[in-house]
């Protein structure tokens, strides 16, 4: 058997339950069924797709796991709004499967962070400014703990995302943030000046948000991400290497 034929032989068909789940998800994402609206009973879905009840149930279970549908008090199935982390982890998996590189991740993160800090500098509420202040204070107290600092870094940027008051930006930046967290932790462990530089950048970003200074915010967001890139390379990594499953496992574990 040739190598090509061997590869063909190993291809497996997509399970029917997955096709059912994908068909329902496409209808939801196209706006055909809106959040809170029913998707139909199991019996109706069996008739619609021409499959058996167990196949429909497996497809429903998959959508429930991803938070796309939920059972209401009357046991009817309705469209739900997936939590950001659930959407993010699915997109994160896709980035790994497509062998996205860290350079691509860095470039996308740069564009998103600049847009996010701009929104935060214009629209941050006093409540979120206070939350950012508490985050910076806690970071200053744990500089010797790389894991704690990396966790607070993730929280800091999540707060800036909320402060931007732009849900599209929040949804878009979550997947890359999940992958940046484990690399940040790695950098902070290997590059001794990493924690104090991170803290300085967070203080300056907070100051820009307080003063509603968009340009200062963009300047420090750019510096902060360039520090991440330099630290990543100094820790012995190549920006052009694909994101591997090790980072996926660590990032998903950190988000659970």
Please provide the spans of the model-predicted regions.
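Short linear motifs at protein or domain termini
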Residues: 1-118, 122, 239, 250-256
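Hydrophobic side-chain positions on well-ordered alpha-helices
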Residues: 27, 142, 161, 208-209
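Short loop-to-helix capping motifs
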Residues: 42, 165-167, 212-214
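Hydrophobic, amphipathic alpha-helical faces that serve as interaction scaffolds
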Residues: 78, 87-88, 96, 108-127, ...
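Alpha-helix C-terminal capping/termination sites
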Residues: 122, 142-145, 210-211
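Amphipathic alpha-helical segments enriched in hydrophobic/aromatic residues interleaved with Lys/Arg
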Residues: 128-142
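Solenoid-repeat scaffolds in large eukaryotic assemblies
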Residues: 129, 149, 217-218
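C-terminal all-alpha effector/ligand-binding and dimerization domain
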Residues: 136, 140, 157, 177-256
